[in-house]
């Protein structure tokens, strides 16, 4: 599903609930297995912008794993940059936003993340080895289409623009 930050997004055939999610991406730089939160920073190469697109019907209404709604072709734009960890003073205090067709849909901050970067790396490393190049998408702020009343979803031809402070824009 991973594509470049400016590649076209293709809404899947039979999709009616394709949704957007601006997220902080954490790029692993050193193998991590069973590490503590205090050790997590040693395993980070850097950070990037991720649009963790989701097809909500595939994800939630067709039973089973969420992977069906998260792994559609072109659903993982990443970048435009890998910003090394030494260039990010506090990954838990970055503004983030996403516009659809010029309208601001998400306007948040990494400081409102349910789980911090160090916790996520430590937690995941207890269940799987994290390898250099792995990217962890850390969650999205309010403003996804599924959460609106009435719900709003992407249509072919819609344009998204998103960014995270200091990490660039897509």
Report each predicted region and the residues it spans:
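Extended, compositionally biased flexible segments
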Residues: 1-12
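General beta-strand structural signal in soluble alpha/beta enzymes
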Residues: 3-4, 49, 138, 162
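Short helix/loop capping segments that flank catalytic or ligand/cofactor-binding pockets
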Residues: 5, 35-37, 57-59
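Short, structured patches in soluble enzyme cores that scaffold and shape functional sites
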Residues: 13, 22-30, 48-53, 82, ...
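N-terminal accessory regions of nucleic-acid-interacting proteins
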Residues: 33-47
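Catalytic-pocket segment enriched in acidic/His residues
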Residues: 56-170
């Amino acid at each position: 599903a991973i594509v470049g930050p400016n590649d076209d997004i293709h809404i899947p055939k039979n999709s009616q609930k394709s949704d957007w999610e601006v997220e902080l991406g954490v790029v692993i730089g050193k193998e991590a297995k069973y590490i503590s939160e205090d050790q997590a920073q040693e395993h980070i190469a850097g950070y990037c912008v991720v649009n963790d697109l989701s097809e909500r019907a595939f994800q939630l209404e067709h039973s089973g794993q969420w992977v069906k709604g998260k792994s559609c072709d072109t659903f993982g734009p990443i970048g435009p940059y890998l910003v090394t960890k030494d260039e990010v003073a506090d990954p838990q205090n970055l503004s983030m936003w996403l516009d659809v067709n010029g309208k601001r849909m998400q306007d948040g901050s990494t400081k409102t993340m349910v789980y911090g970067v160090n916790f996520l790396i430590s937690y995941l490393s207890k269940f799987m080895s994290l390898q250099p190049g792995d990217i962890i998408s850390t969650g999205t702020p309010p403003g996804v289409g599924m959460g609106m009343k009435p719900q709003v979803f992407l249509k072919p031809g819609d344009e998204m623009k998103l960014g995270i402070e200091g990490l660039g824009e897509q």
